Amino acid sequence: MKNKYPRNLLGYGSNTPEVKWPNKARIAVQFVLNYEEGGENCVLHGDKFSEIFLSEIIGTKPIKGRHINMESLYEYGSRVGFWRVHKLFKEYKLPLTIFGVGMALKRNLEICKEMKES
């Protein structure tokens, strides 16, 4: 039976290829940091409501004004979180991929500059 669904959800299926990593390594790891701080919904950005979906606050209701708790969660990442992770990866000379929200990077040029220079 031919599946007409356009996405490949099967992959290799039961025919997993034999992978040979350089230097006989047995595992490959990719580190990715999502940088979103400043790109979330916020009335300061002209949004109708503050962020309600992308947070650790489960069941948040839309607020027409500023949601200080939500803003605080996001600000932790730009004020402290990024710098701690960045320092650690720099210290151990580990590569780090950034999945950055354009608006967030535009609002924090110091972090953007540091990412580009690393």
Report residues per predicted region.
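Catalytic alpha-helical scaffold of carbohydrate-active enzymes acting on polysaccharides/glycoconjugates
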Residues: 2-118
